[in-house]
């Protein structure tokens, strides 16, 4: 069956820091990225895509091109500038106006509470390694629910807790720029899952007319050969990257196998996971109340056994073939010569999306529904005569939508797909040369231009089925 269904969301995704700009306007406090990017000195988010001032235009574009859902996030430090003190009414008003504009344009808002942008004050106090962050986050969520919960029907607690942990404490390309500290990464992930569970409990206690879920980045993990050692490496990477958090969210516990495996990884890296009194009870209570899983999928990894110390080189330039990723006690991610990659060395493997969707259905039968909340292709778009022919992006998205249809036909409940990104936005580690948007942003003028992919996306959104993109007039 080639039909997605009448209620399927064809959305576009954004994030506050990557899109809004206005980092110092209307009482916004600093977040972790303001200081970090200033020190790095390569680019800033001060203007980004200027969504703060141009959201009405972007939502009109969305309506015109059949985008019927949008992922936005609420900048914690725009609403509570230091993360824990007084509420900034101008910050709340911006999001209230933004939500109203979404509804006016028939674009359903999916609203994320944490998308990589902890307020600077709380970051300096330890971020998600500091348990106080949990209570501050719950309070922030309550402020948002009270102000916007009458209109927002889809809430997301966290975007990609694994990415927060991996990039901040293992790769080191996000603040606090620590490398190879797997124990800190795992501890921060656990603490975020406790915060997630407490926010789910809070939301349900408020009897609001809506749903709440979480977004995980879920990557397939495959052995590069059939050897026992390579299979073990793929298993270990899957455990730390995916199963650790999925078990917390949907089982409300760390089953014996998960607990044993995570502790072995921690031990090999000189640490241990600390679970505090009451944590597991909180996870268990929330696990039956989560309404949906948001799944971000860009690529899968191929693993081989690795016995050495951790070694990572992050490809942040688009210089193909420069990535290195080997973790002590886990394995090494390697290229599969049969699988193409992007310029940033991300394997293009739609089968991994299908496999992951089916795995969720089989391993977590209590899941209710899935939204693919991010998927897209970073590309050095060629802007010629006011047009961008991004056929490789269309091909990438088309193949991943085919994988979703296959999973739906096998009984997986998938209710929406959000392309990353709605318009070109700031890339956390690549700045402005890595573009994902349906709409091209000229960052000098902030003018928007529809890419060929936008015209194709409009057709599939209206027809609720895949179409031959060679037929698109552009």
Curated annotation (Swiss-Prot):
D-galactose 6-phosphate binds at residues 18, 115, 159-160, 296, 427-428, 434, 436. Pathway: Carbohydrate metabolism; lactose degradation; D-galactose 6-phosphate and beta-D-glucose from lactose 6-phosphate: step 1/1. It catalyses: a 6-phospho-beta-D-galactoside + H2O = D-galactose 6-phosphate + an alcohol. Its EC number is 3.2.1.85. GO terms for cellular component: cytosol. It is an enzyme of class 3 (hydrolase). Keywords: Glycosidase, Hydrolase. The keyword Nucleotide-binding does not apply. Gene3D superfamilies: Glycosidases (3.20.20.80). GO terms for biological process: lactose catabolic process via tagatose-6-phosphate. Coiled coil: none annotated. GO terms for molecular function: 6-phospho-beta-galactosidase activity; beta-glucosidase activity. The active site is at residues 160, 374. NCBIfam families: lacG (TIGR01233), PRK13511.1 (NF010036). Belongs to the glycosyl hydrolase 1 family. This is 6-phospho-beta-galactosidase. It comes from Clostridium acetobutylicum (strain ATCC 824 / DSM 792 / JCM 1419 / IAM 19013 / LMG 5710 / NBRC 13948 / NRRL B-527 / VKM B-1787 / 2291 / W).
């Amino acid at each position: 069956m080639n039909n997605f269904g009448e209620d399927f969301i064809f959305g576009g995704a954004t994030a506050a820091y990557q899109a809004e700009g206005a980092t110092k306007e209307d009482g916004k406090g600093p977040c972790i990225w303001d200081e970090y990017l200033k020190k790095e000195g390569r680019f800033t988010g001060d203007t980004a895509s200027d969504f703060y001032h141009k959201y009405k235009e972007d939502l009109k574009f969305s309506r015109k091109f059949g985008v019927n859902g949008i992922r936005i996030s609420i900048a914690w430090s725009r609403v509570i500038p230091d993360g824990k003190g007084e509420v900034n009414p101008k910050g709340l008003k911006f999001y209230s106006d933004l939500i109203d504009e979404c509804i006016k344009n028939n674009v359903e808002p999916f609203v994320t509470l944490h998308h990589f942008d902890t307020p600077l004050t709380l970051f300096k106090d330890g971020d998600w390694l500091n348990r106080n962050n949990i209570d501050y986050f719950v309070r922030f969520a309550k402020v948002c629910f009270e102000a916007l919960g009458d209109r927002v029907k889809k809430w997301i607690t966290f975007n990609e807790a694994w990415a927060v942990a991996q990039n901040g404490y293992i790769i080191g390309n996000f603040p606090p720029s620590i490398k190879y500290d797997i124990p800190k990464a795992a501890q921060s992930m656990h603490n975020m899952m406790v915060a997630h569970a407490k926010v789910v409990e809070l939301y349900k206690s408020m009897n609001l007319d809506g749903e709440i879920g979480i977004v995980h980045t879920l990557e397939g993990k495959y052995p590069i050969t059939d050897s026992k050692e390579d299979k073990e490496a793929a298993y270990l990477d899957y455990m730390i990257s995916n199963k650790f958090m999925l078990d917390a969210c949907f089982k409300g516990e760390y089953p014996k196998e998960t607990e044993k495996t995570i502790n072995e990884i921690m031990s090999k890296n000189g640490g241990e996971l600390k679970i505090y009194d009451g944590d597991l009870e909180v996870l268990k209570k929330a696990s039956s109340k989560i309404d949906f899983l948001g799944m971000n999928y860009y690529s899968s990894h191929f693993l081989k056994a690795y016995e050495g110390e951790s070694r990572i080189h992050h490809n942040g330039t688009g210089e193909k073939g420069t990535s290195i990723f080997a973790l002590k006690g886990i394995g090494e991610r390697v290229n599969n010569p049969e699988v193409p990659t992007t310029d940033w060395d991300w394997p293009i493997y739609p089968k991994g999306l299908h496999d992951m969707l089916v795995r969720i259905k089989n391993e977590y039968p209590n899941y209710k529904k899935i939204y693919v909340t991010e998927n897209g292709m970073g590309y050095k778009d060629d802007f010629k005569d006011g047009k961008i022919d991004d056929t490789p992006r269309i091909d990438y998205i088309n193949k991943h939508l085919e994988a979703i249809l296959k999973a739906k036909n096998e009984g997986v409940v998938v209710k929406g797909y959000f392309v990353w990104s709605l318009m070109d936005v700031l890339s956390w580690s690549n700045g402005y040369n890595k573009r994902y948007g349906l709409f091209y942003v000229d960052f000098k003028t902030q003018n928007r231009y529809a890419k060929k992919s936008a015209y194709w996306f409009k057709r599939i959104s209206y027809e609720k089925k895949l179409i031959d993109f060679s037929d698109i007039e552009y």
